Amino acid sequence: MAKEFLIELGTEELPPKQLRTLAEAFAANFAAELATADIAHEGVTWFATPRRLALKVANLAESQPDRVVEKRGPAVNVAFDADGKPTKAAEGWARGNGITVEQAERLVTDKGEWLLFKEQVQGQQTASVVVEMAAKALANLPIAKPMRWGDKETQFIRPVKTLTILFGSELIQGEILGVASARTLRGHRFMGEAEFTIESAEQYPAILEERGKVIADYATRKAMIIEGSQQAAQQLGGIADLEDALVEEVTSLVEWPVVMTAKFEEKFLKVPAEALVYTMKGDQKYFPVYDASKKLLPNFIFVSNIESKEPRHIVEGNEKVVRPRLADAEFFFNTDRKRPLVDRLPLLENAIFQQQLGTIKDKTDRITELAGYIAEQIGADVEKSKRAGLLAKCDLMTSMVFEFTDTQGVMGMHYARHDGEAEEVAVALNEQYMPRFAGDELPSRGVSAAVAMADKLDTIVGIFGIGQAPKGSDPFALRRASLGVLRILVEYGYQLDLVDLIAKAKSLFGDRLTNANVEQEVIEFMLGRFPTWYQDAGFSIDIIQAVLARNPTKPADFDQRVKAVSHFRALEEAEALAAANKRVGNILAKYDGELGEEIDLALLQEDAEKALAEAVEIMAEALEPAFATGNYQEALSKLAGLRAPVDAFFDNVMVMADDEALKKNRLTLLNKLRNLFLQIADISLLQK
């Protein structure tokens, strides 16, 4: 008979940013243990609050199924001697399995015949194995820094206070992490019953809510917070900024969410909204509120962990807590503006970017030069790009950014506007860090794009140049920086060559770099970002590899090629031409001599080779405009027309003729044919 199963681990406050991950891993690990043990069930559900991890298993079977274990013995020709008597090997095997040789069955396969013992193994009772399974599931949680507590040797992410393991109404005896299983559950720290007993797994989690004032279901708490915040914002005439990461964190901080609203003085709205929001979200875990035009309102939403008879006191307390932080932001903003950004440039000499690569002032000088170089190639204003590069890191020396680090860039923009800098320059100071994460917006075209690429390329080339390429960890976020550069080049269609950009960036370091292979390593590293990016976009890996085989170092050009090959692959002729290219490649690989593209028409004998030679010559001329403009889709569509003469050639012509001149001429024809395709991609790599 199947029953509900419950395990709850009561702890001290768990790290909020890890709570969901821990709970999901616990459930996944336990489900894997059940699968390994072959114990049937109808699903594992996890629960998590700041002070507990729990899971329930629906309709968990009371035991493993009985099973037959086949134990193969020695081969028959080894098990018996010439007289047909059992050998010592056979007798020893039989004795070890509690049978006689005569009781053994035979296993016959196409490889021979063996002795066989089929043992009937009774399934274990679920109650006898679940404690060990739960202990394993908990031991394999992703905990970076486990801790010890008291005088115990056990380790966990936080001290464990209670353990409850119920199978239906049966309390499963056992100990995990030094705590014995009991029926005691702990309620909310400040509301409900502090402790109470649970009689059966079916009562969970309802009993926690009814008696303990704890909503154990994570998704329920999260939904309450979102819905309550949206309603509260509407009542304020605004829209709540419910960033999912913050909602998750708040959900992980409360056991009984109560959504409340508060306000702050309107005078603080003179401070850039980003600084106020940084304080509200980062420090206090509040949700900012905006009006319909996305202007910050002097209100915020917060989530209390208790129901109070005097909610006004809680509101006033939160307002009192946030006020000094907002006042600090106001003070920093007013103080910083008394000094132009450019005046802070010398201060960058005192800030180290990287010991071998120099100060942030050194980096600023390189960014300035590289941004101007890039701007010239993409048609952006060179002087504005250089100015933005010069000012790019100056806000790091302001009080605001020193105190509120996440406001770097955006505060530079506000201060630049105050100083009267050109709008493009000011905006670039903020957008230099874009895209900040996967899926983030790109910097604006022109000046912002030039500065953003210059900053990222300087970091990538510099770190590779001193031999610190990322392996497991990536402390300088070089993968993200590389993808950022690639996205800007691809999505804006900038036909810039990475080889040129990297060489220019390298030259600006003077003799600081020690890695002689820095340019090639950076090229390979950046091109290595393409497969995952384009696979995520829906392109198959063989299409990507077909293009990468040509080592295209212009990202925008790579993009055009991938899309063209994807279009080509859908054509009726694609499969046959891909196979033909593979065949051609294999044939050419066996030839040791040098091949050009000059076909000797006088040596063409067969009608099929004459037809192919003529078709290739005509095609080569017809494709010149498409290749010149990078219209690879048009080029491949035209190349698809070669299928018929290619098929006829292989059906009727012996390439590896006995006559050396004839053979070389035919190989030259195939080489010219293959090179037409290779100007775009190696389509021989396309799979069926």
Swiss-Prot record:
Chief place where the protein resides: cytoplasm
Organism superkingdom: Bacteria
A Pfam entry, by short name: DALR_1
Localization per Swiss-Prot or TrEMBL: Cytoplasm
Keyword Signal: no
Keyword match Cytoplasm: yes
Enzyme class: ligase
Any one annotated GO CC term: cytosol
GO molecular function: arginine-tRNA ligase activity; ATP binding; glycine-tRNA ligase activity
EC code(s) of this entry: 6.1.1.14
NCBIfam families reported in the protein's UniProt record: glyS (TIGR00211)
Family label: Belongs to the class-II aminoacyl-tRNA synthetase family.
Subunit (UniProt): Tetramer of two alpha and two beta subunits.
Record-given protein name: Glycine--tRNA ligase beta subunit
Annotated source species: Vibrio cholerae serotype O1 (strain ATCC 39315 / El Tor Inaba N16961)
Lineage summary: Bacteria, Pseudomonadati, Pseudomonadota, Gammaproteobacteria, Vibrionales
